């Protein structure tokens, strides 16, 4: 159903925002390579209602970015309603008079800050905070994984938080599908590699296929960051990243090393010699012993020995929060068939259709409510007409008036959320902005780097032992290198 939207335009970080005129700008929030975000107030709401409006930039400049946007739109719709995943309220796509696209706008749940800002602020956090945050991350992951989706870019900057410690996972642009069948799983080609500091070692080491364990590793890195106040593995490049992991976890056993898909990387690790493991209690002497036990299992080098999300939720460290009845799974698997589409015009039409479908999806309950309202009005009018025909004209019409007065109350609906547990909070105001200490951005994959013309002039030369890439590039691209 096509609905007319009256828009107005204002500036956000010197870029035009053309949005529904009922939304009034509050302030600029942030901007990056893929979008610009502001907060806005919905002027027609009975209560103060604010949202985050994100303008996705450069959506149709590259196939890679278009597919990333389409992926995020579909996933936010699929996961809509889970308490630990950011909620997409609405979306809009604005066209120029000539039919070209002006911008894609997402109207999302407004959260007060992200976890990177909280950690960077240095405000005192307690073990109760760590338990609550870790539990909420795992609840969100359980729901995501149950739909056969891997997030692939969990990091503090992608965890949105409110002052009451409510946490929500965001940014699904790098997500990908997962199958227990290795053959099917290998077909989910990735377009990006995840952020280096939180990237599981099996991705760098070219293990045979990704598993859900990669997100558990990232969550473990975040737990370590809670305990230490800084990233546990802060590599300046991918070789240094591997070195930092080995310096803490020690040299993996031979059975694990044999599963590394690159002989070049195997040789490098052997050349380092034996590296002893550093007990986590040495790194975090003041931490809860149960937190360290959970961390030990989340940061197992071998993904086959790493704790699962379900097991982690049952760990004693999280027992104060664990409630199986309040840890739902997604009712449907996510469909990744759109990933095989590579024609830009086809992808553009899919984005437009997704926006139209979502707008109808979120408006359907309102349309049904309006239909019920009209039906009730018609029934009331019919009843009043019948009463007037049956009763003398001088009969008091107080009952009808009372019915009309009560009518709005009968139709009133509550959008309130159950109150959160009040025990502790965080300071979410005047936090530091993202700076040079922010994790490096995920890099584009080799699939995108490959020349579209088939010209190999820009492909890096092979080195002496016949490998296509040097050690740094092998670790950076991991499994993607075999598709180059």
UniProtKB/Swiss-Prot annotation:
Residues 383-392 have a biased composition (Low complexity). It catalyses: L-seryl-[protein] + ATP = O-phospho-L-seryl-[protein] + ADP + H(+); L-threonyl-[protein] + ATP = O-phospho-L-threonyl-[protein] + ADP + H(+). Residues 23-318 form the Protein kinase domain. The modification Phosphothreonine is found at residue 190. Its EC number is 2.7.11.24. ATP binds at residues 29-37, 54. A motif (TXY) lies at residues 190-192. GO terms for cellular component: cellular bud neck; cellular bud tip; cytoplasm; cytosol; mating projection tip; mitochondrion; nucleus. Activated by tyrosine and threonine phosphorylation by MKK1 and MKK2. The modification Phosphotyrosine is found at residue 192. GO terms for molecular function: ATP binding; MAP kinase activity; protein kinase activity; protein serine kinase activity; protein serine/threonine kinase activity. The active site is at 153 (proton acceptor). GO terms for biological process: cell integrity MAPK cascade; endoplasmic reticulum unfolded protein response; fungal-type cell wall biogenesis; intracellular signal transduction; IRE1-mediated unfolded protein response; pexophagy; positive regulation of division septum assembly; regulation of cell size. Its cofactor is Mg(2+). Keywords: ATP-binding, Kinase, Nucleotide-binding, Phosphoprotein, Serine/threonine-protein kinase, Transferase. Residues 383-403, 426-464 are annotated as: Disordered. Dually phosphorylated on Thr-190 and Tyr-192, which activates the enzyme. Serine/threonine protein kinase involved in a signal transduction pathway that plays a role in yeast cell morphogenesis and cell growth. This pathway seems to start by SMP3; then involve the kinase PKC1 that may act the BCK1 kinase that then phosphorylates MKK1 and MKK2 which themselves phosphorylate the SLT2/MPK1 kinase which itself then phosphorylates and activates the transcription factor RLM1. Directly phosphorylates BCY1 upon TOR complex 1 (TORC1) inhibition. Belongs to the protein kinase superfamily. CMGC Ser/Thr protein kinase family. MAP kinase subfamily. Present with 3230 molecules/cell in log phase SD medium. This is Mitogen-activated protein kinase SLT2/MPK1. It comes from Saccharomyces cerevisiae (strain ATCC 204508 / S288c) (Baker's yeast). The lineage of its organism: Eukaryota, Fungi, Dikarya, Ascomycota, Saccharomycotina. The gene is SLT2.
